[in-house]
Amino acid sequence: MKLHVAALATLAVVCILAAGSEAAPKAMSDPAVVKAQLFPDAFWESFKNVSMEFKKMVHGLQTSNIGEHAKSLYTDTVAVLTPYLQKIRENVTKMYQVYVESKQH
């Protein structure tokens, strides 16, 4: 049960990030906006925590004895989410670069 809750929570975060990632390039075009409010240090700490929890969940699924049906569902879910995760990773990388540049000025 705990594993299912973690999977659903992670899926919710992925969906939220995917929805926000479409608007991210527009926001990044104005460095003043980035500096002012979009990416405080707490945002990046939270993002690191979510990423770490996702990695733990994936490792747990890969190493657990959950049965072939559940592993098949997991594999199918990862196949569907991978393109979205790659787009999110690209956009978050861009946002982080802008964030780092804003800290240097």
From Swiss-Prot:
Record key words, sorted: HDL, Lipid transport, Secreted, Signal, Transport
Annotated signal sequence range: 1-21
Coiled-coil regions listed in the entry: none
Tissue spec: Plasma.
The keyword Phosphoprotein is annotated on this UniProt entry: no
GO cellular component: high-density lipoprotein particle
Prodomain residues: 22-29
Localization in the cell: Secreted
Top-rank taxon: Eukaryota
One Gene Ontology biological process: lipid transport
Keyword Secreted recorded: yes
Protein name: Blood plasma apolipoprotein LAL1
